[in-house]
Swiss-Prot record:
Stored PANTHER family: HISTIDINOL-PHOSPHATE AMINOTRANSFERASE (PTHR43643:SF3), HISTIDINOL-PHOSPHATE AMINOTRANSFERASE 2 (PTHR43643)
Entry-linked InterPro entries: Aminotransferase_I/II_large, HisP_aminotrans, HistidinolP_aminotransfase, PyrdxlP-dep_Trfase, PyrdxlP-dep_Trfase_major, PyrdxlP-dep_Trfase_small
A biological process term (GO) from this entry: L-histidine biosynthetic process
Pathway: Amino-acid biosynthesis; L-histidine biosynthesis; L-histidine from 5-phospho-alpha-D-ribose 1-diphosphate: step 7/9
Lineage: Bacteria, Pseudomonadati, Pseudomonadota, Alphaproteobacteria, Hyphomonadales
Subunit structure comment from the entry: Homodimer.
UniProt-listed SUPFAM superfamilies: PLP-dependent transferases
Name of the protein in question: Histidinol-phosphate aminotransferase
Keywords: Amino-acid biosynthesis, Aminotransferase, Histidine biosynthesis, Pyridoxal phosphate, Transferase
Reaction catalysis annotation: L-histidinol phosphate + 2-oxoglutarate = 3-(imidazol-4-yl)-2-oxopropyl phosphate + L-glutamate
EC number: 2.6.1.9
Family: Belongs to the class-II pyridoxal-phosphate-dependent aminotransferase family. Histidinol-phosphate aminotransferase subfamily.
Length: 367
């Protein structure tokens, strides 16, 4: 007997939502793979985080603290935040994107983001029935006026990654303030600071202070990048008290594992580890940018832990990507972000960075 056709259908806006496409894997590698596709910290996590996670593993039979008070207090202390109750935690910053969208946007509403923005903004908007509106970019950056010109009475959320992924571009703090001041009060302004630690403590403090200027602004952060806890799935945000209260209503009661919370507490204030990671990134990002430009591959300045380089055509970018794979080097093709002639390359270890440069030099010499 044939199996009956299922009559269970997803909601139309769910069926229409295109899923997030992560960085690829390298199958059939001949040796050690240079992982330069996902913007991970080449040093791994802070040793303090590793030790804390090991200790916490002995108690995984006990539910986590549902309030995450120690984690929120540690984040607030490390980031100069006076009121830890305005810090919220999450299973990666993706969860913050989803929960804020669930709280503030739905069918008939618009969620605004820039043309080459992190694709989870679009996924979350679609998952909650909202309409995605993209702001065109010039030289991989959307200016304040362009963003404001896309705002409508239906706009409920503006997501702005600063620095942006995958382009590495950013608006200045003065531009962020101008944008914040000009936004209508009904628009939630979410600044995604996933890569802000790479700009240093002064910029982090400026983002924090941006939240305190208006009651419609949220700063979102992650432990996946400079802190090296990508597999832990740990994020946080700083927001006005009223928005935090709404967020906490629908956050899962145990959304962060006790192991992730312990690791976060241990590493969020590890300034020596952060400085080492930031200095390494700044040093090698400059070397890689200069080397690629010298090869005739236009590579603009980046403010994150990756660079984006131009190959002139879709075909040449694909050929370069395949050449790197053939040499056990994994980078990120970003055609899905509307940038098919470019590749995004994470700043990795010194050895992996040099392997990448040597392989690409061989490619450009032959093509």
């Amino acid at each position: 007997m044939s199996k009956p056709i299922s009559q269970i259908e997803p909601l139309p806006h769910i069926a229409a939502t295109k899923p997030y496409v992560p960085g690829g894997k390298l199958h059939g590698a001949k040796g050690a793979v240079a992982m330069l596709a996902s913007n991970e910290n080449p040093f791994g996590p802070s040793p303090k985080a590793v030790e804390a996670a090991k200790a916490a593993a002995a108690n995984v039979h006990v539910y986590p603290d549902p309030d995450y008070g120690p984690l929120r207090a540690a984040i607030a202390a490390a980031k100069g935040i006076a009121d830890a109750s305005r810090v919220v935690t999450s299973a990666g910053s993706d969860e913050i994107i989803h929960l804020l969208t669930q709280c503030y946007a739905g069918p008939g509403d618009e969620v605004l983001f820039t043309e080459h923005a992190f694709s989870m903004y679009r996924v979350s908007a679609g998952a909650h029935g909202a309409t995605s509106v993209t702001v065109p970019e010039t030289d991989m950056t959307a200016g304040v006026n362009a963003i404001l010109g896309a705002v409508s009475p239906r706009t409920k959320i503006l997501f702005l990654a600063n620095p942006n992924n995958p382009t590495g571009t950013m608006l200045s703090v003065d531009e962020l303030k101008a944008l914040q001041d000009a936004l209508p009060p009904h628009v939630l302004f979410v600044v995604d600071g996933a890569y802000s630690e790479y700009l240093g403590p002064d910029y982090e403090a400026q983002l924090r202070d941006l939240v305190d200027r208006r009651d419609n602004t949220v700063m979102m952060r992650t432990f996946s990048k400079i802190y090296g806890l990508a597999a832990m799935r740990l994020g946080w945000a700083y927001m006005p008290a009223g928005i935090a209260a709404i967020y906490q209503r629908i956050r899962g009661p145990f959304n962060v594992s006790s192991i992730a919370a312990a690791a976060g507490i241990a590493c969020v204030g590890d300034e020596a580890f952060l400085k080492m990671s930031r200095d390494h990134n700044t040093h090698w990002r400059a070397i890689m940018t200069d080397a690629l430009n010298a090869m005739g591959l236009p590579t603009p300045p980046s403010h994150a832990n990756f660079i984006v380089t131009e190959f002139g055509s879709d075909e040449r970018a694909a050929a370069a990507n395949q050449h790197l794979k053939d040499n056990d080097i994994l980078v990120r093709a970003i055609g899905g972000y509307g940038l098919p002639t470019k590749l995004r390359i994470s700043v990795g270890s010194a050895d992996d960075n040099q392997r990448f440069l040597d392989a690409l030099k061989a490619f450009t010499a032959s093509r």
